[in-house]
A protein has these predicted regions:
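Enzymes that bind and transform nitrogen-containing heteroaromatic metabolites
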Residues: 1-197
Length: 197
């Protein structure tokens, strides 16, 4: 069965965005450090290449997410993020929404059905694993439904004091690996501990 993998940037104090969705803190660590940037890009490309389907929440899909990465893939060959942009552009993407039936983006489908049922059906399809890019609400719903199989949390050496969390209730995870980058970010890979263990 395919795994559902979550990749998400988090602050030291456990938020994935500021109170109003701000994400500027993601760029504070290692600003201008090209070696650290290449490390992060390498990690992102490797994780994305292990998957052939990306899941998005409605808010992220309705933003400029798809058009931004399409532009990088097609018009910016010198951009260090170009290899990741090509994967994002060319892979199947599914946006979950209760209100939208179409959203802009190449290889983007909109799913209006039950989240748990749809994700479980995707996991049972043949293919590579599935990667989640999403906002706090969408990811929080996936976590609450126990749908995430692997968590790749990129901990930034930044605290913002208040913001949006992804964990709405107690969740016990087991650390499988940890990788520190030169600019101070740390990628922790966690897997869920089965209830009752």
């Amino acid at each position: 069965m395919r795994k559902l993998k979550l990749q998400m940037q988090v602050t030291l104090d456990g938020f994935v965005a500021g109170p109003n969705g701000e994400g500027d803190w993601v760029f504070l660590a290692g600003k201008g450090d090209t070696e650290a940037l290449q490390q992060m890009i390498g990690f992102g490309v490797e994780l994305a290449a292990s998957c052939d389907t990306f899941l998005l929440g409605r808010k992220l899909a309705a933003s400029s997410f798809c058009t931004y990465w399409e532009n990088v893939a097609e018009n910016q060959p010198e951009n260090p993020w170009n290899p990741l942009a090509k994967l994002i552009t060319n892979h199947r993407k599914i946006a979950f929404s209760h209100s939208e039936t179409t959203l802009p983006g190449r290889n983007l489908e909109v799913e209006n059905g039950n989240l748990a049922t749809a994700v479980q059906a995707l996991k049972e399809q043949p293919g590579k694993d599935i990667l989640v890019y999403g906002g706090a609400d969408f990811v929080g719903s996936l976590i609450s439904l126990n749908l995430i199989d692997e968590y790749y949390l990129i901990v930034n050496p930044v605290a913002i004091g208040a913001g949006l969390p992804i964990f709405k209730e107690r969740k016990v995870l087991e650390l499988e690996s940890s990788m520190a980058f030169k600019h101070g970010k740390i990628v922790n890979k966690y897997v869920p501990v089965p209830v009752g263990s």
